[in-house]
A protein has these predicted regions:
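Generic marker of "main functional regions" within proteins
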Residues: 20, 27-31, 59, 72, ...
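Charged, amphipathic alpha-helical interaction segments
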Residues: 18, 22, 69-73, 100
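A broadly conserved amphipathic alpha-helix scaffold signal in soluble, globular proteins
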Residues: 15-18, 65-66, 96, 113-117
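Generic structural signal for well-ordered, non-membrane alpha-helical segments
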Residues: 2-17, 42, 61, 84, ...
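N-terminal Rossmann-like NAD(P)+-binding subdomain of aldehyde/semialdehyde dehydrogenases
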Residues: 1-47
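Conserved small-residue-rich beta-alpha loop and adjacent elements
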Residues: 31-93
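Conserved NAD(P)+-binding/catalytic subdomain of aldehyde/semialdehyde dehydrogenases
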Residues: 99-125
Length: 125
């Protein structure tokens, strides 16, 4: 069960992080010079990322998950080890808020290896 005060704090932090990182989003550039040369700068989104969230740190999930969501990453895998046999409700709330469907309840090298070799994520944070 998630304490309503914690939920409110997460919602507040989420909005602030979202606003800041939206400002960082790079735009594609299309340019035609006077000689009719077309120059293009195109951003290509990473197709999948793995987020390693150690222990009870929903802030880590926010700080790495929100930018991935803004960038348009299609598949996000979150690894968060159980603490005293339980999933952290605050981290799970962040995962739900970000629409993360792939959640691993493991930690350490096993989590990193699973995200790299089983889920085949392109980048791990």
């Amino acid at each position: 069960m998630l304490d309503p005060k914690v939920k409110k704090a997460i919602d507040f932090a989420y909005q602030r992080i979202l606003k800041f990182h939206k400002l960082q989003k790079v735009k594609d550039i299309n340019y035609v010079d006077k000689l009719k040369n077309k120059i293009q700068y195109k951003n290509i989104v990473i197709d999948s990322v793995g987020l390693y969230v150690p222990a009870n740190l929903p802030s880590t999930a926010l700080m790495v998950g929100v930018p991935a969501k803004i960038a348009g990453v299609k598949k996000i895998v979150l690894a968060n080890p159980r603490h005293n046999g339980k999933l952290n409700p605050a981290v799970m709330y962040v995962a739900k808020k970000l629409g993360i469907k792939n959640i691993l309840s493991i930690g350490g090298a096993q989590a990193i290896a699973s995200m790299a070799y089983i889920y085949k994520t392109s980048k791990i944070f």
